[in-house]
Amino acid sequence: MARPWLSASVLITAVILLVDYLNYYRLRKRLGGIPVVGDASYFWRRIRWTESDTNFQKVIQHGYDTFSKKAKPFAFWGQHEDFILVLPPGSCEEVKHLGPEKLNFLQAVEDSYHFKLHTNILGRSHVDAVRQSVNKNMNQLHEIVVKKAEETIPKLFDDIAASNEPFAAFLTIWHLVHIVSASYLVGTEFCANEEYLQAIEYYCINVPNFIYGYFWVPVPLRRLYWYLSPQGYKVRACKAKLKTFIVPKIRETISAWQNGQKSSSYTLLGAMLDLKAQKGQIKRDPTAMTKAELERQIDIFSDEMIFTGFDSAGPVACMVTQLLFEALRDKDLTKALRQELKSALEANNGQWNVQAMNLTPKLDSFTRESLRVNGPTLLSVTRTVMEPMQLKSGLSLQSGSIISSPSWLIHNDEDNYENAHQFDPYRFYNPSTNAVTTKVTTASTNFLGYGYGTQMCPGRHLGIKMSQILFSKLLMRYDGEFADAKAGKPANIVTSGQVLPPYYAKVILKRRGI
């Protein structure tokens, strides 16, 4: 008996797999003769049973040792189902001045996460607002972070410390960072809004989780996965909930601005509004825009605010966690940092002000060393090629390709740093002058923690300052140890783009002096 449904199913499946394979072939052809590490046959790649999936650190190290060390490019198959082209060390000098019209970081983020499905991130208002406003308001931002940290840390950690029970450090620090960052991203009232905090944290976790499944399915089925999968629904529902909090705040801010009212406290939302006004995207005269255009701009505005929450908290949470972990495993370092902080505070009447934090060169060196060894970036200077170009080496870059630099491997290369695999908290500290030899945020071809060139992370100064304040507050208030004291600091998680602290690694804290 004929079974037409079975024949149709087989045919449809064959067509889907053929289209998916042809997409891979197209992407592979775009690479030309560039060698690929960790690649495998179509079937094993499709079910993600390759060496890249099981031991990516080994794969990327092999590519670096075999090709990068000989000034040659290589590529690997990323989790976004496309190749990432790893340029040879030193290529950063050639591309560092190229703007987003030629090499675009935000487009690379879009291509890697497909934010276009749910969030508009390609407008540059959030990036330009950070670049134009954060550094000149740094003193006020410093005060905001200190105040909110002093309010929040005891609430989150004192009961945990009193219980003497192990807890997942990263997850609690993650929550702390979201509370503190909300105060200067959207407004202090959001720090106490548990529904907003739950939604933004959920969004930040579920977007990467969704994308992992989205890119796992063959190309022709991805739109269906977005609309029909539980994971896609969770992202859509979470974003809709976030908009119920953020859109009214944007409307309120625009209305106050149109009426000539000015906020006494800095927020990135306010800075973005000023920038949008400069660009003519939002008008001070309410009658100068149609209702439809205003609604469109508010929708874009809210998307940019949501993405900023996604983009800003993760690196700081990782940094604070890594600093805490390194301090927990080195009691002498903990003692030295506490003494330095104590002296800096005494010199400033106990105030955690900018001047006090400027008197902590050991902390600066320690922070830079943690960035060198512990990420959070595995790759840096990541860009999507917007138009075909050729490097001086003769390497041709095709439009649509994603390029990057092997920053973490460069940081751990003995040719760049003596005893590179050893964590030395004083590597960038000069004891004879009691000063850092290189500032935490200074980039070079051998230090790419925050990128390089004109598209370096514009929020790096605030990110470092916030990380140091939160870590220092924890260090001065609590003693601690790893739950598994014998095992010590747990190994980092190395993914195809990041070096992360283990999310569930547990520590035990205790109030100092108690």
From Swiss-Prot:
Q: Which gene encodes it?
A: verB
* InterPro entries, per database record: Cyt_P450 (IPR001128), Cyt_P450_E_grp-IV (IPR002403), Cyt_P450_sf (IPR036396)
For this protein, the Enzyme Commission number is 1.-.-.-
Protein name, as recorded: Cytochrome P450 monooxygenase verB
Q: What induces it?
A: Expression is regulated by the cluster-specific regulator verZ.
Q: Which residues bind heme?
A: C457
Q: Has the keyword Cell membrane been applied to this entry? A: no
An example GO BP is:
secondary metabolic process
Q: Member of which family?
A: Belongs to the cytochrome P450 family.
Q: What class of enzyme is it?
A: oxidoreductase
What cofactors are annotated for this protein? heme
Q: How does it sit in the membrane?
A: Single-pass membrane protein
Entry's localization field:
Membrane
Query: Known PANTHER family for this protein?
Result: CYTOCHROME P450, P450, PUTATIVE (EUROFUNG)-RELATED
Pathway assignment reads:
Mycotoxin biosynthesis
Disruption-associated phenotype? Completely abolishes the 11'-deoxyverticillin A production.
Asked if the record carries the keyword Cell membrane, the reply is no
> What are its GO cellular component terms?
membrane
What Pfam families has UniProt attached to this entry?
p450
